[in-house]
């Protein structure tokens, strides 16, 4: 039994040894096949870890709920009714967006602006490391203390439509971890502006926006102006051209308290093309037509009383235009607008031209009555030579030329006795006609009578022509010609007078 048990134990040991060797070999090959996969998975996990590390380096990982905790932390330490301790410096930046218009009659300017205010409040600081790396946050303005900075010369303030919508939700201020607060908002302000109307419509205006604190003096709040002006969002105005935007820091006393103030001065120049085209040019055309109508000679016989009506009509037109301008500009008792002065000048010129027409009509009427001016006035108007010249022809009698004289006398019975003298040297009549030639002489006399009747008819025609010439001379005598020269002279004089001012105005435009 002892040997048998020993053999059984030996056989069992051998079988178990073989089984263990087989399982070890299989596990070895299994492990050798899985090893590359495990190594690859390990390498992949390392690369993914590096990528996550890089992402975390570029974008800080915020802890959820940090913004809420930060807001609660800041509001718990801050009192909206308590200003920061010590002297507070406020940097004020104003960006001009658009000039909505200038009301000359009310002396106001309306502008659209963007406002940025910067100040530091130590009670609104935090450590970004304690709040998930947050370096800035936003809190509504009605939850923190804000300096009471207003526009001192403001007449009216209008809120924008989208600004009203935002105010119903919240008006946030940007707060940085070091306590710097940035408050931005758009606004439409109507400010008072002293309008100088002396050179209207060629005027330049300067309007200021005065920024200051209402309750705090400069021992508590000092304003600092941002000098770099950005006109990136500026939209040009069709009537006003922006010349310059100047910023200055000033001080003034308000109710016994010295206050720090920032003044934004806007320099503008009016674009006068609209007024030149709609008012100045029509006024010039009316004056020029009136002057030409007053002095142009369309007739030399009729009177010209109707031209006074034309002059009065032009004067009334100038008065209406001046009223149109006076309704737009302020009613000042110190200065007269340039455009109104131009209309008054035209009224005076047309009035003087109408009175001058009366003088010309008086001179013309003297000519129609047949009066003649003196040689002095004729020479003054270049109607006669200035220097006298003698054009008389000299005649000399030729003693050798015979002269015949026919003496005609009328007898009672109608007979005509004709005597012929041959020379003036006292030669007597040689002989009396023979009776034999009497019949021939009578025939000759009959022909002479017919000839005389023809001459008489021709003389009557000459008299009629002389009468017509006399009438013509009466209508174009010296005074009439002088009146013509006066018409031409005054027409060019007054046309030049009304043309030069409008040419200067258009040149300055």
Swiss-Prot record:
Consequence when changing residue 347 to T: In sa297; defective in posterior body wall contraction (pBoc)
Cellular component GO terms, alphabetical: acetylcholine-gated channel complex; neuron projection; plasma membrane; postsynapse; synapse
Disruption phenotype: Loss of posterior body wall muscle contractions (pBoc).
Family: Belongs to the ligand-gated ion channel (TC 1.A.9) family. Acetylcholine receptor (TC 1.A.9.1) subfamily.
Assembly and binders: The functional channel is a heterooligomer of pbo-5 and pbo-6. May self-associate to form homooligomers with negligible ion channel activity.
Topology of this chain in the membrane: Multi-pass membrane protein
Extracellular topological intervals: 22-275
Cytoplasmic side, ranges: 357-487
InterPro entries registered for this protein in UniProt: Neur_chan_lig-bd, Neur_chan_lig-bd_sf, Neur_channel, Neuro-gated_channel_TM_sf, Neuro_actylchol_rec, Neurotrans-gated_channel_TM, Neurotransmitter_ion_chnl_CS
Classification via CDD domains: LGIC_ECD_cation, LGIC_TM_cation
Subcellular location: Membrane
Encoding gene per record: pbo-5
Protein name: Proton-gated ion channel subunit pbo-5
Cysteine-cysteine disulfides: 193-207
GO molecular function: excitatory extracellular ligand-gated monoatomic ion channel activity; extracellular ligand-gated monoatomic ion channel activity; transmembrane signaling receptor activity; transmitter-gated monoatomic ion channel activity involved in regulation of postsynaptic membrane potential
Transmembrane segments: 276-296, 310-330, 336-356, 488-508
One BP annotation, GO: defecation
Tissue specificity as recorded in UniProt: Expressed in the posterior body muscles. Also detected in the RIFL, RIFR and RIS head neurons.
Gene3D superfamilies: Neurotransmitter-gated ion-channel ligand-binding domain, Neurotransmitter-gated ion-channel transmembrane domain
Function: Forms a proton-gated ion channel with pbo-6 that is activated by acidification of the posterior coelomic space, leading to posterior body wall muscle contraction (pBoc) during the defecation cycle. Probably by regulating the defecation motor program, required for fatty acid uptake by intestinal cells. Does not bind neurotransmitters such as acetylcholine, gamma-aminobutyric acid, glycine, serotonin, glutamate or choline.
């Amino acid at each position: 039994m002892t040997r048998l048990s020993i053999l059984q134990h030996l056989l069992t040991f051998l079988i178990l040894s073989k089984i263990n060797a087989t399982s070890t070999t299989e596990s070895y090959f299994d492990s050798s096949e899985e090893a590359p996969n495990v190594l690859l998975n390990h390498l992949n996990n390392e690369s993914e870890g590096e990528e996550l590390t890089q992402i975390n380096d570029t974008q800080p990982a915020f802890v959820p709920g940090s913004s809420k905790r930060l807001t609660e932390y800041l509001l718990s330490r801050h009192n909206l009714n308590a200003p920061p301790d010590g002297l507070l410096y406020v940097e004020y930046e104003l960006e001009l967006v658009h000039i909505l218009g200038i009301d000359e009659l009310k002396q106001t300017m309306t502008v659209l602006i963007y406002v940025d205010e910067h100040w530091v409040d130590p009670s609104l600081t935090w450590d970004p490391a304690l709040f998930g790396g947050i370096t800035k946050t936003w809190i509504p303005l009605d939850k923190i203390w804000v300096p009471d900075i207003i526009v001192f010369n403001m007449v009216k303030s209008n809120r924008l439509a989208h600004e009203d919508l935002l105010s119903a939700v919240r008006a946030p201020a940007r707060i940085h971890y070091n306590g710097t607060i940035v408050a931005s908002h758009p606004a439409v302000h109507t400010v008072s502006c002293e309008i100088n109307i002396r050179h209207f419509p060629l005027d330049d205006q300067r309007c200021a926006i005065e920024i200051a604190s209402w309750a705090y003096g400069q021992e508590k709040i000092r304003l600092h102006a941002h000098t770099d002006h950005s006109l990136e969002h500026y939209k040009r105005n069709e009537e006003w051209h922006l010349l310059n935007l100047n910023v200055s820091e000033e001080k003034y006393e308000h109710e016994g308290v010295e206050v720090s103030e920032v003044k934004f001065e806007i320099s503008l120049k009016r674009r006068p093309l609209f007024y030149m085209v709609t008012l100045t040019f029509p006024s010039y055309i009316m004056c020029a037509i009136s002057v030409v109508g007053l002095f142009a000679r369309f007739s030399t016989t009729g009177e010209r009383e109707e031209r006074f009506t034309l002059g009065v009509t032009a004067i009334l037109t100038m008065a209406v235009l001046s009223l149109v301008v006076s309704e737009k500009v302020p009613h000042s008792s110190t200065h007269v607008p340039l455009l109104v002065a131009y209309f008054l000048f035209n009224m005076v010129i047309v009035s003087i031209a109408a009175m001058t027409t009366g003088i010309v009509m008086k001179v013309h009427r003297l000519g129609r009555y047949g009066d003649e001016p003196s040689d002095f006035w004729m020479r003054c108007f270049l109607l006669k030579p200035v220097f006298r010249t003698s054009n008389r022809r000299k005649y000399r009698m030729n003693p050798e030329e015979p002269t015949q004289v026919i003496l005609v006398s009328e007898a009672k019975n109608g007979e005509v006795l004709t005597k012929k003298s041959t020379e003036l040297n006292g030669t007597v009549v040689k002989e009396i006609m023979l009776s034999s030639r009497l019949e021939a002489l009578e025939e000759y006399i009959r022909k002479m009578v017919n000839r005389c009747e023809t001459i008489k008819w021709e003389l009557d025609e000459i008299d009629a022509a002389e009468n017509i010439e006399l009438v013509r001379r009466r209508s174009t005598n010296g005074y009439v010609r002088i009146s013509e020269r006066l018409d031409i002279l005054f027409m060019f004089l007054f046309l030049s007078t009304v043309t030069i001012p409008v040419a200067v105005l258009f040149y300055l435009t």
